[in-house]
Amino acid sequence: MPFGIDNTDFTVLAGLVLAVLLYVKRNSIKELLMSDDGDITAVSSGNRDIAQVVTENNKNYLVLYASQTGTAEDYAKKFSKELVAKFNLNVMCADVENYDFESLNDVPVIVSIFISTYGEGDFPDGAVNFEDFICNAEAGALSNLRYNMFGLGNSTYEFFNGAAKKAEKHLSAAGAIRLGKLGEADDGAGTTDEDYMAWKDSILEVLKDELHLDEQEAKFTSQFQYTVLNEITDSMSLGEPSAHYLPSHQLNRNADGIQLGPFDLSQPYIAPIVKSRELFSSNDRNCIHSEFDLSGSNIKYSTGDHLAVWPSNPLEKVEQFLSIFNLDPETIFDLKPLDPTVKVPFPTPTTIGAAIKHYLEITGPVSRQLFSSLIQFAPNADVKEKLTLLSKDKDQFAVEITSKYFNIADALKYLSDGAKWDTVPMQFLVESVPQMTPRYYSISSSSLSEKQTVHVTSIVENFPNPELPDAPPVVGVTTNLLRNIQLAQNNVNIAETNLPVHYDLNGPRKLFANYKLPVHVRRSNFRLPSNPSTPVIMIGPGTGVAPFRGFIRERVAFLESQKKGGNNVSLGKHILFYGSRNTDDFLYQDEWPEYAKKLDGSFEMVVAHSRLPNTKKVYVQDKLKDYEDQVFEMINNGAFIYVCGDAKGMAKGVSTALVGILSRGKSITTDEATELIKMLKTSGRYQEDVW
């Protein structure tokens, strides 16, 4: 076997990989089956037969999505709305998680499939049944199916759009007929929206021919009945993350008062932040360490998992959004689906202010697709002409909108010179503005040493607008929320600080009072080898060090427990390549020497500083080359390699450096070394947690 791993070790490793995969999938299925949220089911009748639902609801087009973080769902819904607006089609848009597909060959309409790739070429967790069905479909079993497909992936990963390509391969083998080209969005290149627009334009031309469609001027038709109500009741949402937290509901707890899950995208846990501190502060950057207490729930996590943190929008951005659309935040409204295959996107009834603060993603970049949809609501002819031009010209859109980091309100105020967009219906905003999604952070604690506490390490995004020096700074929604909490928790008067944005820290009905936020744990395959004697190479600059702090704390706790039990355990070599700009932003600087002492010399840390005064820039990939002999020996002795951090630059640079190390160490070509790196990734010995 290659790289010093014998047959027994390889068998154990393969079993481990399979076990982790099964655990992740099993957990998703278990969570789906255990959920008691009635809004999760897309069809009110509970019918899971996809062909029957399409037929019974008189649909003439089907859009399916398999989404891990909500992006595929967002684009599927955009596409569905355009089919309705331009061609008056009766479209069903559905999550594959909610249906069975044995009758897929009997679906009498064309199907569009939007599918995200998760991890190492995997299908999203909710697509277990869909993946199983298409991968086991026999030749000719889907010969009646006509479909098109759009994949969402990241080219910095080894298996770029792997799920979409796998789905397309198996659908084709089963006889399904693909219409048009396979679309591939590349988040790694930052071109997801433009990739979608190019694919969508080509597919619409195909559909015009296939279905003999006549395009009409886009006209918004809501999927919901919108009703204004008069009074607030206990059953009305004021921004609660799910209906479970309304006063009219009772949370599910055991005899000890522990809140029971499952906790996931549909129902997060409201976790107290018991401690937060600033790791460093400079003129342009801050880093916050936050500790979330999970002891009031039955949530379990493993070292290497991610914590999903649900933010609310900053008060300044909420006010800006309300102003440009001339909306009254106190207006109470309800939404009722006009179609049984459609679900309400968030708890209603609610107020306009609550929806905008808690449920809609109002601070993100605006898309050309949204501009195209907004043309019908332009406040005057000049603005309509501008919108039309920008929605069709991606280069001009990039110059005027994207490069300036405009959100929706910024862009519309810029285009209309401050004129209100007061003819835009609230239903349009609900259906066109993306839903708020959680932000995922690599957990920086160990489940062995902090069993019921999760640590998160976050750089606060806050920088001047590069194109508009007089504009407000560009800010990250969740990281600035964590900074607001850190200051308040440490008795700093926020009113006296120069913060770029502020938040309602109490939340709906004071649900978030005393520093709480909605969270859930997302399982990861980013795991230490089960054999403690296995060598480990960790590479993580900046906040990419977060999971490795968890890894090392795990090894410290393990070694201490073994010593207490009288066991003499020998740890394999653990080396961490860490990078920071300078000594001022060296994360957890005081902790690492203590870990080295406790691990009896089995832990070594190598630091690269990229911005020390009067010195050459040094990055982690440079340090890998400096330690080439040691790195090669460790890999040859079966080391596991872990990389965490920036996908575009660092992760590629690290991969290139390791290819060079293997090429020189084994006296093989670069291509051969590249194939060896691919083998390591496939076997689970080279793992990445990158963004």
Swiss-Prot record:
Record keywords: Cell membrane, Endoplasmic reticulum, FAD, Flavoprotein, FMN, Isopeptide bond, Lipid biosynthesis, Lipid metabolism, Membrane, Mitochondrion, Mitochondrion outer membrane, NADP, Oxidoreductase, Phosphoprotein, Steroid biosynthesis, Steroid metabolism, Sterol biosynthesis, Sterol metabolism, Transmembrane, Transmembrane helix, Ubl conjugation
Annotated positions binding NADP(+): 285, 543, 610-611, 617-621, 646
GO cellular component, one term: endoplasmic reticulum membrane
Domain FAD-binding FR-type: 266-529
Domain Flavodoxin-like: 61-204
PTM note: Phosphorylated by the cyclin-CDK PCL1-PHO85.
Enzyme class at the top of the EC tree: oxidoreductase
Cofactor note: Binds 1 FAD per monomer.
Keyword Signal listed: no
Membrane spanning residue stretches: 8-24
Crosslinked residue numbers (Glycyl lysine isopeptide (Lys-Gly) (interchain with G-Cter in ubiquitin)): 666
Bilayer disposition of the protein: Single-pass membrane protein
Residues bound to FAD: 439-442, 457-459, 476-479, 691
Stretches assigned to the Cytoplasmic side: 25-691
Recorded phenotype for the gene knockout or disruption: Accumulates 20% of ergosterol of wild type.
Side Lumenal, residues: 2-7
Induction: By galactose and on the plasma membrane by iron or copper deficiency. Repressed by glucose.
InterPro entries (alphabetical): CysJ-like_FAD-binding, FAD-bd_FR_type, Flavdoxin-like, Flavodoxin/NO_synth, Flavoprot_Pyr_Nucl_cyt_Rdtase, Flavoprotein-like_sf, FNR_nucleotide-bd, NADPH_Cyt_P450_Rdtase_alpha
Molecular functions (GO terms): electron transfer activity; flavin adenine dinucleotide binding; FMN binding; NADP binding; NADPH dehydrogenase activity; NADPH-hemoprotein reductase activity
Cofactor(s) this protein requires: FAD; FMN
A Pfam family of this chain: FAD_binding_1
UniProt-annotated location(s): Endoplasmic reticulum membrane; Mitochondrion outer membrane; Cell membrane
Primary role: This enzyme is required for electron transfer from NADP to cytochrome P450 in microsomes. It can also provide electron transfer to heme oxygenase and cytochrome B5. Involved in ergosterol biosynthesis. Has NADPH-dependent ferrireductase activity on the plasma membrane.
Other known facts: Present with 46600 molecules/cell in log phase SD medium.
The protein, known as: NADPH--cytochrome P450 reductase
Organism listed in the record: Saccharomyces cerevisiae (strain ATCC 204508 / S288c) (Baker's yeast)
Lineage per the UniProt record: Eukaryota, Fungi, Dikarya, Ascomycota, Saccharomycotina
Gene assigned in the entry: NCP1
